[in-house]
Amino acid sequence: MLQKPRGTQDFFLDETKLWIKVETKLREILNKFNYSEIRTPMFESKELFIRSIGSTSDIVSKEMYEFVDKKNRSLVLKPEGTASVVRAVVENKLYAEDYLPFKTYYISPMFRYERPQNGRYRQFHQLGIEVYGSDSIQQDYEVLNIANNIINDFKLNKNIKIYTNYLITGKNREQYILELKKYLTDFKLCNDCNIRIEKNPLRVLDCKIDDKQFNNVPSMKDFLTDEEQKRYQQTLDLFKEMNISTIHDDKLVRGLDYYTGFIFEIKYEAKNIEQTIIAGGRYNNLVYEIGNINLPACGFGMGLERFINIIKEQNNKLNKNDQSIDLYTICLDQSAIKLNQQILELSRSIGLISDSNYYNMSLKSALKKSDKLNPKYLIILGEKEATSNQFIIKNKINKTEIKTTLTNFVNDLK
């Protein structure tokens, strides 16, 4: 029997309803901050991700789904969303003054060839928000505040921590990297990190195998320029003034090479589980790397699979099955088909979710199906109802019944 590819999922029934509720609520939150949705292609040029993510990253070196098209062009299923948005900004000239700051978001599937595990899939879904054209610390605050609003609005505050750091971009970067390499020589590193330490030592701190042993890593804060120190402190002060609690983490570097300056991760830490659910920061050089245009940018990404798993774990009310149908009709005779369809059309015209027993079944089976759907109203139609054009509406909530006709049907439902 054919099965779905490893690391992918099928969504249906209650699971799909939960996803739609989550996505709808996320869009409502982002609309309040005046962010508009962007949709980019599912596949892009391979070169786009080499330029943006970095050739030494795990994503580019190991995890991309690559293919060559009929004209011998190297393409990949997009492994992350930011590079695609930057490409769209440059290609469509969204850096023009009239558009700035360009505030946008996406909800999209991504693809990475990695080992499937709890909360990690080869096809996964990501919410991303992006802001282009603003280098203000207020913009950094807004980005983290949106993430914080998402956590609060979904009532997931329990076991949540926000970690921050500031990646060196100034003249002291090379000095810090030398100090870091010196520190790392005392450790036995995994094969990947032995390569990273030569190409990009900062990436060693993001290693999921070795990171637990780096307890006294040199602090980036000690190497920041006066200007960087001032900006980072002003950003942290603003968070504190606005009652957003953060924790500085010297080892926080992010898994993508394009980040510069302020970065953050929001983690869910419970029992023996530690998962990053939202992560982002500044990437002021990325638009230049891709499109040769100086344009500051910041944003974050959120894995929806992990986020929805936490909703389920915390027994969030969004995960509760609410009444999913307003009206169910049971049609027991061929002569009642027209009346049945007329009732359904009328009920849907006033916004009721309505269904019927289209599958040929007995009254007993149809009533069992009705009990499963738990409708507010139930109507049973047979030859008698078709002949008289009268039928009974059963209110399953308050256990009342009313006899009506098509003419009075809508009024009698109110």
Swiss-Prot record:
This protein's record includes keyword Methyltransferase: no
Cellular component per GO, a single term: cytoplasm
Lineage, uppermost ranks: Bacteria, Bacillati, Mycoplasmatota, Mollicutes, Mycoplasmataceae
GO molecular function: ATP binding; histidine-tRNA ligase activity
Organism field: Mycoplasma capricolum subsp. capricolum (strain California kid / ATCC 27343 / NCTC 10154)
Family: Belongs to the class-II aminoacyl-tRNA synthetase family.
EC number annotated for this UniProt entry: 6.1.1.21
Enzyme class at the top of the EC tree: ligase
Annotated protein name in UniProt: Histidine--tRNA ligase
Keywords: Aminoacyl-tRNA synthetase, ATP-binding, Cytoplasm, Ligase, Nucleotide-binding, Protein biosynthesis
Catalytic activity: tRNA(His) + L-histidine + ATP = L-histidyl-tRNA(His) + AMP + diphosphate + H(+)
Gene Ontology biological process terms, A to Z: histidyl-tRNA aminoacylation
Subunit structure: Homodimer.
